[in-house]
Amino acid sequence: MGRVIRNQRKGAGSIFTSHTRLRQGAAKLRTLDYAERHGYIRGVVKQIVHDAGRGAPLAKVVFRDPYKYKLREETFIANEGVHTGQFIYAGKNASLNVGNILPLGSVPEGTIVSNVEERPGDRGALARTSGNYVIVIGHNPDENKTRIRLPSGAKKIVSSDARGVIGVIAGGGRVDKPLLKAGRAFHKYKVKRNSWPKTRGVAMNPVDHPHGGGNHQHIGKASTISRGAVSGQKAGLIAARRTGLLRGSQKTQD
């Protein structure tokens, strides 16, 4: 009988869980409150910090608590153009400036926004990685819905009350620069998770992987595997709808 293969061990967690010791904490929008729903609230960017394992910088923004005599520090994903000392306005009546947080129903069509909520109040779910953004395509005031275009090119309909941050997430073009050497990849994954270096299945022995063994490195059978296969067989192209090169132009579904 073969060994427990790598993806079975990953499912158990343990050494494969993400490395969070140096993280700055969850980057979310403000909790949706009366001030944001009916007017606006002002905060100031205190500092812009690096978050280990994340491609985009984070902005520490301080707001006055609308209900208590205290200050609240929020951690936002920094947009391109945001700087320390900048005022950030959040709410329905906020101005249309980079870094401000508005409901999608309050921004004109064609506006570029990021860290967009899927449901009002979930504090940001879409277009959160460096250089990403969402484009507002159109509004339907009767149903209180807004149509947006995601970074993947897919279109999505969300509530017009869902909030977004005006502008593009900072750190764009990060993946265009090659790592060039193994040492940089080592440091990259050291703060992310234990997923590097990755030994190929065909380079293993038959006990270690379904693709292992043979007098030369070849898979020896179809690399596609069914969704219902047992976990020890699940290696390769799992439940692939199609394989091979994509030919012709790619069309996104409207």
Swiss-Prot record:
Q: Which GO terms describe its molecular function?
A: RNA binding; rRNA binding; structural constituent of ribosome
Q: Name one GO cellular component term.
A: cytosolic large ribosomal subunit
Organism equals Eremothecium gossypii (strain ATCC 10895 / CBS 109.51 / FGSC 9923 / NRRL Y-1056) (Yeast)
Q: Which gene encodes it?
A: RPL2
User: What family is it from?
Assistant: Belongs to the universal ribosomal protein uL2 family.
InterPro entries in alphabetical order = NA-bd_OB-fold (IPR012340), Rib_uL2_dom2 (IPR014722), Ribosomal_uL2 (IPR002171), Ribosomal_uL2_C (IPR022669), Ribosomal_uL2_CS (IPR022671), Ribosomal_uL2_dom3 (IPR014726), Ribosomal_uL2_RNA-bd_dom (IPR022666), Translation_prot_SH3-like_sf (IPR008991)
Q: Which Pfam families match?
A: Ribosomal_L2, Ribosomal_L2_C
Q: Please report the name of this protein according to its UniProt entry.
A: Large ribosomal subunit protein uL2
- Kindly state which keywords UniProt assigns to this record, in alphabetical order: Ribonucleoprotein, Ribosomal protein, RNA-binding, rRNA-binding
